């Protein structure tokens, strides 16, 4: 069977369904795929297809996720849905599926529940920038006032976590009825996707962001200078660009890129995804090392203290067998290197058990190029015991 060609004319966005268990996330995912395939052509997905989520390994953590794709008139979407609550937490923290926006599913019959709150908080912490709300199971509630109350409750909850609760689109529908093909409820799915199309902005492409490349290796070429190799994480770099070497050292160092090579060939420029060697002017071999990053000046800064949202691996996932306490000192693995850090648990939290997720503050012994949303692993003796994401920078 010939593979379908990927249509690049439409903008691409990554979204996912979030919300409390049994509020209808997977049914909604199936309904969107089915309704849009009727409207746009393409393949429908059944509930069973999506619910049997394959296990994936992301940085040693086992996560069950389903990936579904569909398109609207203007966009192509990759949609991620997770069967279990723990899978969501892991998915969002590891960034296994980076989301440009999310659809928060809330059952109109139950209103917001504990996981609704937790998923909104996680979205805030890990940087899911935009949410649209789908109030599900509205066919089961015939009291208009009750629906309005639930909507107000959801909006208040979103505002509590710094989302614009008053402006977020809230669509009332029934995923199950839409999946069963009832036209009035199918219309609500179309309305939902119109809201997603218009409310969730087109994500900035990796190549349009400011240049950054984590340094993987460094070597000197006699007579030419020092070369740093690595994979460009974002943006573009051209010969003649000024870049900063950031991290580990107290001060960032500025230098000019005098050559860009890929597969032993010279290039004019390189962009996100390319594995390159960058020749740096006036940089001694010992002035740059693995773990630092090359970046557009001023675009990212070195830090030691931050708040993080962390998932601690369970024993079954190969994590710790025992809890840890405040002042725990593991290695924090950022991009290409380990740095020792000190964990401080929030007030009133005495210890963290394997399998938990927790917000903690971390102090690294050396500065690293960090920003909100930077992902890291926590390691002990080379094995991964946790995964986290920088929620806010403190110093």
Curated annotation (Swiss-Prot):
Residue ranges of domain tr-type G in the record: 10-204
Domain of life: Bacteria
Keywords carried by this UniProt record: Cytoplasm, Elongation factor, GTP-binding, Hydrolase, Magnesium, Metal-binding, Nucleotide-binding, Protein biosynthesis
Region of interest (G5), ranges: 174-176
GO cellular-component term (any): cytosol
Stretches the record annotates as G1: 19-26
Region (G2): 60-64
Residue positions binding GTP: 19-26, 81-85, 136-139
Main location: cytoplasm
Catalytic reactions on record: GTP + H2O = GDP + phosphate + H(+)
Binding site for Mg(2+): 26
Compartment annotation: Cytoplasm
Chain segments carrying region G3: 81-84
Region (G4): 136-139
Nucleotide-binding found in the keyword field: yes
E.C. no: 3.6.5.3
Enzyme class: hydrolase
One MF annotation (Gene Ontology) recorded for this entry: GTP binding
Assembly with partners or alone: Monomer.
Family: Belongs to the TRAFAC class translation factor GTPase superfamily. Classic translation factor GTPase family. EF-Tu/EF-1A subfamily.
Function: GTP hydrolase that promotes the GTP-dependent binding of aminoacyl-tRNA to the A-site of ribosomes during protein biosynthesis.
Protein name: Elongation factor Tu
Organism this protein belongs to: Lysinibacillus sphaericus (strain C3-41)
Gene that produces this protein: tuf
């Amino acid at each position: 069977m010939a593979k379908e060609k990927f249509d690049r004319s439409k903008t691409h966005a990554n979204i996912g369904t979030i919300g409390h268990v049994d509020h209808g996330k997977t049914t909604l995912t199936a309904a969107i795929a089915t309704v849009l395939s009727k409207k746009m052509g393409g393949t429908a997905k059944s509930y069973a297809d999506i619910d049997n989520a394959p296990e994936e390994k992301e940085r040693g953590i086992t996560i069950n996720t389903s990936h579904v794709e569909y398109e609207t008139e203007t966009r192509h979407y990759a949609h991620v849905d997770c069967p279990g609550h723990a899978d969501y937490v892991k998915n969002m923290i590891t960034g296994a599926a980076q989301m440009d926006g999310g659809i928060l599913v809330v059952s109109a019959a139950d209103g917001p529940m504990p996981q609704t709150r937790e998923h909104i908080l996680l979205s805030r912490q890990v940087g899911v920038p935009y949410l649209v709300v789908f109030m599900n199971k509205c066919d089961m509630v015939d009291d208009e006032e009750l629906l309005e109350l639930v909507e107000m409750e959801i909006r208040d909850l979103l505002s509590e976590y710094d989302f614009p609760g008053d402006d977020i689109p809230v669509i009332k529908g029934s995923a199950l009825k839409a999946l069963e093909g009832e036209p009035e409820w199918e219309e609500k799915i179309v309305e939902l996707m119109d809201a997603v199309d218009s409310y969730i902005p087109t994500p900035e492409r990796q190549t349009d962001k400011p240049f950054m490349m984590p340094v993987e290796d460094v070597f000197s070429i006699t007579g030419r200078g020092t070369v740093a190799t690595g994979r460009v994480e974002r943006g573009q770099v051209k010969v003649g660009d000024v870049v900063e070497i950031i991290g580990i050292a107290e001060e960032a160092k500025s230098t000019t890129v005098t050559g860009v090579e890929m597969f032993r060939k010279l290039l004019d420029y390189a962009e996100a995804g390319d594995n390159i060697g960058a020749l740096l002017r006036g940089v001694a071999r010992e002035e740059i090392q693995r773990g630092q990053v090359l970046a557009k000046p001023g675009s990212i800064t070195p830090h030691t203290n931050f708040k993080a949202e962390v998932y601690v691996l369970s024993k079954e996932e190969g994590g710790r067998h025992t809890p840890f306490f405040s002042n725990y000192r593991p290695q924090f693995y950022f991009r290409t290197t380990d740095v020792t850090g000190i964990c401080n648990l929030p007030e009133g939290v005495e210890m963290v058990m394997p399998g938990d997720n927790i917000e903690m503050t971390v102090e690294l012994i050396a500065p690293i190029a960090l920003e909100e949303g930077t992902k890291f692993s926590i390691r002990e003796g080379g094995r991964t015991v946790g995964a986290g994401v920088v929620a806010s920078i403190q110093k």
